Amino acid sequence: MLKSNDCLFSLENLFFEKPDEVENHPDNEKSLDWFLPPAPLISEIPDTQELEEELESHKLLGQEKRPKMLTSNLKITNEDTNYISLTQKFQFAFPSDKYEQDDLNLEGVGNNDLSHIAGKLTYASQKYKNHIGTEIAPEKSVPDDTKLVNFAEDKGESTSVFRKRLFKISDNIHGSAYSNDNELDSHIGSVKIVQTEMNKGKSRNYSNSKQKFQYSANVFTANNAFSASEIGEGMFKAPSFSVAFQPHDIQEVTENGLGSLKAVTEIPAKFRSIFKEFPYFNYIQSKAFDDLLYTDRNFVICAPTGSGKTVVFELAITRLLMEVPLPWLNIKIVYMAPIKALCSQRFDDWKEKFGPIGLNCKELTGDTVMDDLFEIQHAHIIMTTPEKWDSMTRKWRDNSLVQLVRLFLIDEVHIVKDENRGPTLEVVVSRMKTVQSVSQTLKNTSTAIPMRFVAVSATIPNAEDIAEWLSDGERPAVCLKMDESHRPVKLQKVVLGFPCSSNQTEFKFDLTLNYKIASVIQMYSDQKPTLVFCATRKGVQQAASVLVKDAKFIMTVEQKQRLQKYAYSVRDSKLRDILKDGAAYHHAGMELSDRKVVEGAFTVGDLPVLFTTSTLAMGVNLPAHLVVIKSTMHYAGGLFEEYSETDILQMIGRAGRPQFDTTATAVIMTRLSTRDKYIQMLACRDTVESSLHRHLIEHLNAEIVLHTITDVNIAVEWIRSTLLYIRALKNPSHYGFASGLNKDGIEAKLQELCLKNLNDLSSLDLIKMDEGVNFKPTEAGRLMAWYYITFETVKKFYTISGKETLSDLVTLIAGCKEFLDIQLRINEKKTLNTLNKDPNRITIRFPMEGRIKTREMKVNCLIQAQLGCIPIQDFALTQDTAKIFRHGSRITRWLSDFVAAQEKKFAVLLNSLILAKCFRCKLWENSLHVSKQLEKIGITLSNAIVNAGLTSFKKIEETDARELELILNRHPPFGTQIKETVMYLPKYELKVEQITRYSDTTAEILVTVILRNFEQLQTKRTASDSHYVTLIIGDADNQVVYLHKITDSVLLKAGSWAKKIAVKRALKSEDLSINLISSEFVGLDIQQKLTVFYLEPKRFGNQITMQRKSETQISHSKHSDISTIAGPNKGTTASKKPGNRECNHLCKSKHTCGHDCCKIGVAQKSEIKESTISSYLSDLRNRNAVSSVPPVKRLKIQMNKSQSVDLKEFGFTPKPSLPSISRSEYLNISELPIMEQWDQPEIYGKVRQEPSEYQDKEVLNVNFELGNEVWDDFDDENLEVTSFSTDTEKTKISGFGNTLSSSTRGSKLPLQESKSKFQREMSNSFVSSHEMSDISLSNSAMPKFSASSMTKLPQQAGNAVIVHFQERKPQNLSPEIEKQCFTFSEKNPNSSNYKKVDFFIRNSECKKEVDFSMYHPDDEADEMKSLLGIFDGIF
């Protein structure tokens, strides 16, 4: 490496080093103190006069020595002492505003002053004639003899020798090659940014025998340079020629000047350990020292990245600790940074610094559960983000913690102009100002320490506005502005503009930049580590691959071996190949182990180039000598957009390694059209503006919930405390106001803006507004503020109907605004489609139609995959899933509270409670992987437990501990620990009974929740102290009957909890669904059904409403969805026929039972009272007369030979002509399937209206026969196929008969005792199977139910029909008849075919009803005897 002292360098050298310079300080001081790291001794620093004399003696370029020293400010002097050092054409200093007009151009400067520049331009103009911008002709103003000459390449001689620097600095810090003028053409524009162009083919390799290497990685590109065709002319725009650096004052570095730096010894002894890393504070820290340590004024400092701003915060903390006596109990310090990574860094740093002196630190970021509030109670320093602190402070009136904050530290306060995050920061600071003012009014201001704001910002032009915003009424904030000169590592900033045609996509433009990376690295890296930021993860891999092909790195053998070792330790095969060649990539979608390997290799300097996404800039601190931002567009929210200024500054801030470098370079590669924008940005000329006016609605609601705002006037007053107000007064046009408005006009506009947002809130009932324009929060608005939910999400859930299933809710949640930052990437679609639908794998529970095409479908798929324990191999998808569940758990908790507060329907409330628990446990509510919730059990061990058949907590507890260890392949006492964990889970029992006080419209039930193991839980509990269960009861009308949360602490006191609940009668059914839902555990829930008994049917005037199939059924089968099965409501109101009386059926609900007589009544009884048995026989004959459907199967009843029966009487006879209205119109057989006919109550009404007509014509619709000869005219095959086509569906339902019999026995009918024997006998006969092979279905069939609903809801529509049929069936049938009746039943023991029993059902619905009150034990024997002759009477 060339020696740093009086070395020779040539203009032909490719690489250069920027001089160490100090820019003007903004203060109006004539001279400021400065020193360079490492600081020289005072005796070594020459006097200012000597420096000026030295400058005078080196005017001419041909002299042997020339110092790299800056001259006095052009504004002060116009002498001939103004020089531009050779390498200053690459200076990227940014002037303060007061020097903006002092740009030098050729007309205003003497020839000798700029001779070397003129020579440079002359030489360049001979090579490049065509540049965009102004063409320069320097030959006219500069004599030929001042033109520069080239140095000999092989000789160390030169016609122009310069002294490289004023102070000698060791070789290991500075060593570089210098730029070759033949290859490098650099124009210096008035914008203070250098645009650079290299000529293809002219550069030479810069490794020669005299060069020593600090880093052993040299870049050799294939082409070694840019060509004009590769880069395009637009890269080098030189609109005008002017000096590219800010002229500086020659700093007076004197003994007194150095003495103005503050020493750490000024800090009290017990706090000096905080600043133990250095003996003196740097210039910026020293300037801020007095204001921070000796006053309590609010403080704003603007300084470049890396200038030691963190120490400013530490000084402010030290001031507070000095003021507050020990112990520091009642103080909180809040550090707020825009990203979690900065909070983590600060947490790790300050935990070590402040821990020894007794301060506790706590990181509060992300969706932290509110349990962390208890930990924060004991923390002194809290690191948080604006979003998290916003959600915390929305409850500050309820929480005294926030009022204890005495110091509020804001890092990167310039992000307040960020479109998305800025409004949150602005609102939080304004709210903290409100907290301060309220606490001061509540306390004695003379004794209380006021809250202090200390804010740190990157260099911004309007820092005074930030200071004004942070000022309180009495004391304005101190504002300290520092420029780039105080950065410990001087940063050179380059913006390269590349042509991009209008038809060229962003993807294609990004690809073209990949081929220019090698030349940029070669030019600017100085053979030191380089960091390249790319827009996408795929772009990172592509760029690294292109560089490895285009360039070869010269590395030592040891370095190659170390890279080989790194390569073998990574999992990613692509990364392994690239890493061997000296490059690597890093992004958040990689395996954690791979990322750590790459970070380690880059940190120690073994890795020359690292490609990464912008996430690295926000997270891991990996500084580099050169930072390249390849393309300023990135993919966010489904479209390409420019990086925010925060992102750009954060990425640029990675340039410079204080422990290695004194200079660093940042290069931005962008399109020509946006080049000027980034020049302005890097010059820090972008004014900070507020974005609060675009996001006002959520924050207004939050302030109303806090009662900060109660009317419009206070709303405007609140806005006055924001940055929005300050900037609107100064720049109204930016906020859509007329530029000529005065203060009153702007305030009126702001008030109008407030009212618009307030009306939107009021429209969704989030706030209540009265005529006086006063506001009050509603419960919905309070929940929206507490759970930090966006207005758009609340708007979406206001449209729910109340019948949403789990699937519907998941779909709604997936479309929430909170998931806008989730992106659907091309390479993820295959994995997602496999999760959605794949016949060969386990897929998600509710598959979506079609392929995965949108962000919402991706979110939906990942939610279901996580809940279904389906492993996701893609690490990027795993990360997205974690982010989704952070937001999703908050949204689902809000949803369950919101639905409860809105008094929505039972089904959606139950499902929202279950879904909130699912998100918390990351399991479906019916999952077999209950063991995954236990400590030390992950998805792998959980799969092993499920494969062993242990799918519930009960089974796990009953399993031997050693067997568990065998299943899990773990050593003792692992199995014992698992068993203990399960043992100490709460075990609930739910008892529900109806209180025997019956009424027509209401019933009382007693619900008891029992904690079975409450004695065991007194000593130890697996569940958290905050665990609770929710008791929710709903009726058949989808209404919530009762909702209550029961905490474990309540149950632990007595072991049980009981509540008497009044239940109003539902229209559709008397069934109640009682559910006990655990808040944190899957596998503890209990679901029960209860059928409530009421005295009288529900009547409305003279009509009884009959509603059938539209009942809401909530079923909880093991693998069935918690859903609302809602069929079409085909119920009609049947009027009672004039002259009819009410039947004697004791149906629980006459409008839902299966009897027509319950709806339309029965004919009045004749005067001559018939006996019970004769009435029954008459009823049976009438039924036989009315029945109109031919039998499905032939009845072959074996008669005794002794019985004289005329077969012709029962033979087949053609039917007489039917009435004008055809039978198909009555029964709708041709149009409707048999399954739907049960829901046509008007059919029965019409049949009943003309019974005499059928009787008179003596049409026998059911015929019995003994032989085959009379059936010859029938098409048996068609009949049987027709009947069984419908039967097949029903026979799949198993066990229904038993359910019916048990439900009948379990119901609380008054006459239950007298009928018990009768029902038991019937249960053993007909109820066990409803398929009667001898009896044909007349005109109806049962509704179709799911298996789960049939199991769980015994009293469905039509069940009552079967019950009455059972009660009416004669018991003592002859053996022959029984044998024939149950022939088909034996074939299908589990089937439930209602078609076959409808012959008897039709009887029960027609002429006469059986009054069960007439059945007494005394009459039973006589009736049974008479019953033996029933068939004799018929046949």
Curated annotation (Swiss-Prot):
Residues 290-478 form the Helicase ATP-binding domain. Might have a zinc-finger. It catalyses: Couples ATP hydrolysis with the unwinding of duplex DNA by translocating in the 3'-5' direction; ATP + H2O = ADP + phosphate + H(+). It comes from the Eukaryota. One of its GO terms (cellular component) is nucleus. Its cofactor is Zn(2+). A zinc finger (C4-type) spans 1143-1158. It holds the Pfam family DEAD. Residues 519-720 form the Helicase C-terminal domain. SMART domains: DEXDc, HELICc, Sec63. Preferentially expressed in testis and ovary. Keywords: ATP-binding, Disease variant, Helicase, Hydrolase, Isomerase, Meiosis, Metal-binding, Nucleotide-binding, Premature ovarian failure, Zinc, Zinc-finger. Residues 777-1092 form the SEC63 domain. One of its GO terms (molecular function) is ATP binding. Residues 1296-1306 have a biased composition (Polar residues). CDD domains: DEXHc_HFM1 (cd18023), SF2_C_Ski2 (cd18795). It is linked to Premature ovarian failure 9: An ovarian disorder defined as the cessation of ovarian function under the age of 40 years. It is characterized by oligomenorrhea or amenorrhea, in the presence of elevated levels of serum gonadotropins and low estradiol. Belongs to the helicase family. SKI2 subfamily. PANTHER family: HELICASE FOR MEIOSIS 1, HFM1, ATP DEPENDENT DNA HELICASE HOMOLOG. This is Probable ATP-dependent DNA helicase HFM1.
